[in-house]
A protein has these predicted regions:
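A contiguous, well-ordered beta/alpha segment that forms the leading edge of an enzyme domain
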Residues: 1-135, 154-161, 234-304
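Short, surface-exposed beta-strand-loop junctions and turns on beta-sheet-rich folds
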Residues: 13, 143, 178-179, 215, ...
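Single conserved position on a long alpha-helix in the C-terminal lobe of the eukaryotic protein kinase
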Residues: 175-229
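Active-site-proximal beta-strand/loop segments in catalytic clefts of secreted hydrolases
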Residues: 9-10, 82-86, 165-166, 186-188, ...
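Generic hydrophobic alpha-helical membrane-span motif
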Residues: 8, 82, 148-149, 173, ...
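RNase III-family endoribonuclease catalytic core
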Residues: 120-121, 126-189, 194-195
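Short, acidic, Ser/Thr-enriched surface-loop or helix-capping motifs
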Residues: 121, 165, 218, 229-230, ...
């Protein structure tokens, strides 16, 4: 996981904040290692599972099993963690400054889908029934690691409040000094030097943004980004960015990716049932939707 992590922590005990931050960073790094498919995170890691789970069930590290257990209880087919073959095809095409061949794209889609793998929660094992399937947890791993780091911080009794920021996946622990909520900025999806506006995070809340500006390349004036529709294998064109405020960093990360793949009308329907989620959406045409439960605290940047 290639991301910059910053932790601001406050303590009423001398030296406690530095110790807590070091411990939280170690937790983040360990969680990131076992959920990263590109680097060998050791026994029970996703790297090992992707290498061996087609031959026999792989016993998972507790951190990886915990994340897969969460995902196993999510019913949304629109977010497919078995999309790695398609992701790899696009990464190869990007390195050669071209588009994937349509027939190659269709072939890679044959090796995706929840039916291609089996997670046994009781045994904490993972197996694949297709030798070409691989899981990619990039849509949720950062949020999961942020929650793990936050749990480590809270074990230090002297920590009064903290803010964790892992590449835009942000979590608040307590209110900031002065008992005020944390105000965090949302990146403008078309201006890397500007922000769209700010939202407030209270104790325990998290924010995550998925956008077409984070990893992309352009061909003939068309932007090809990394958030792929698992039905078509193509970059989703519904939004420029989706920011989600949620009770956990994992929930925020999961739903920001999921909502990026859904039309705004469906997102609104889901928000009716999920009262603990709030969103800021930049549509493909640049218009902005802010959910009703965020209207009073949302502060757009000047000129927005």
């Amino acid at each position: 996981m290639d991301t910059f992590v910053k932790i601001d922590a406050y303590s009423d005990k001398p030296g406690e904040a530095r110790l807590a931050i070091d411990d939280a960073m170690q937790t983040f790094q360990k969680t990131a290692q076992v959920t990263d498919r590109f680097n060998d995170g050791g026994p029970g890691s996703l790297y090992e599972a992707n290498s061996k789970a087609a031959a026999a069930p792989v016993t998972l590290a507790p951190q990886l099993a915990g994340l897969l257990n969460y995902l196993d209880h999510q019913p949304d087919a629109q977010l497919d963690i078995a999309i790695a073959p398609v992701v790899d095809l696009w990464q190869l095409a990007r390195s050669q400054n071209r588009l994937p061949a349509p027939e190659k794209l269709q072939e890679s889609l044959r090796h995706t889908g929840k039916d291609k793998y089996h997670f046994d929660a009781a045994a904490q094992t993972l197996s694949y029934n297709d030798p070409d399937v691989k899981l990619d947890l990039g849509s949720v791993a950062k949020g999961y690691a942020v929650d793990a780091a936050a749990a480590t911080l809270k074990k230090h009794s002297g920590i009064t409040c903290a803010l964790i920021n892992a590449g835009g996946n942000i979590k608040a622990i307590g209110n900031k000094p002065g008992n005020m909520p944390w105000r965090v900025a949302i990146q403008h999806p078309r201006d890397p030097e500007a922000f769209l506006g700010t939202v407030m995070l209270h104790d325990g809340q998290s924010a995550a943004t998925s956008g077409d500006y984070q990893r992309y390349y352009e061909l003939n004036g068309i932007r090809y980004h990394h958030i792929l529709d698992p039905q078509t294998g193509q970059p989703s064109r519904l939004h420029q960015s989706v920011t989600v405020i949620a009770p956990s960093a994992l929930d925020a990360d999961y739903h920001s990716t999921l909502f990026f793949l859904l039309p705004t009308t469906e997102i609104k329907n889901r928000l009716t049932a999920a009262k603990d989620l709030a969103v800021v959406i930049v549509e493909n045409d640049g218009s902005i939707f802010v959910s009703e439960n965020l209207q009073q605290t949302w502060q757009p940047a000047k000129g927005i």
